[in-house]
Regions:
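Carbohydrate-active catalytic/glycan-binding domains of CAZyme proteins
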Residues: 1-234
Length: 235
């Protein structure tokens, strides 16, 4: 079930409502607020439902509820995330395409569709970790993908660390493939030391990322070059 907690300050304290939302079942809800101020609840499945003005209930009018049909029929387990960019609606979602999850998406001109399945924009993690649950935020003109991974806990992927990478779009609005970079986001001042594990791009072979201390994963990473002419680029 999905519950609601209310606070008068973003930092709380939050007071939970006595009962969960009526007519809503499942996990990993997403709230999307359109340009006109109308809020929608997005749930795995994938369904989009108008929220009432109190934000404590959803509309029971069938016309205010839409199931996105233009998605894979299997492997939709959790966490859809809806966002808007340049007037287009992007329904993004984790998809267990084979075994592990990728991130895929659909696009539409209207919130209730019809949507067009666009494919994958974030591949499975190399170590087969199921940690693609994500959100997408635009800040100061740049769009960012937030997700989590088990870089600090490879033996137990439930101890997940937050990751962020930039998202870029093609001229037709489609999302370019996002590759985890370990670079992080933001701009490094020219007079600051650069952490060399944070690369924008690396050569296809001859280098890798390793832990500074294999007994203490929180010590950070290093870039290891083991072939001539291997390189790492930081933008």
């Amino acid at each position: 079930r999905v519950g609601v907690a209310i606070a008068h300050n973003p930092f709380g304290p939050y007071i939970p409502e006595a009962t969960p939302l009526e007519g809503v079942g499942g996990i990993d809800p997403c709230i999307f607020v359109d340009d006109d101020g109308q809020a929608y609840l997005v749930m795995p499945g994938i369904t989009i439902t108008k929220m009432n003005d109190d934000w404590l209930s959803v509309s029971t009018d069938p016309a205010d509820r839409h199931r996105v049909e233009e998605v894979p029929t299997k492997g939709l387990v959790e966490g859809p995330y809806l966002f808007k960019h340049n007037g287009k609606y992007y329904m993004t979602f984790p998809w267990a395409r084979d075994v592990e999850e990728v991130l895929a998406y659909c696009m539409a001109d209207n919130i209730f569709g019809p949507y067009k399945f666009m494919g994958v924009f974030f591949e499975e993690h190399a170590n087969k970790c199921w940690t693609n649950h994500h959100s997408i935020i635009e800040f100061k003109g740049q769009t960012y993908l937030f997700y989590h991974h088990n870089d600090y806990s490879p033996a137990f992927d439930k101890n997940r660390s937050v990751c962020a990478d930039s998202i870029f779009f093609e001229p037709d609005g489609s999302i370019r493939m996002v590759k985890p970079s370990l670079r992080g986001i933001g701009v490094t001042q020219a007079n600051k030391e650069i952490q060399i594990d944070r690369y924008s791009e690396i050569s296809q072979s001859g280098d890798s990322i390793a832990y500074l201390d294999t007994t203490n994963y929180f010590a950070g990473w290093k870039t290891v070059f083991y072939e001539k002419n291997a390189w790492a680029q930081y933008n």
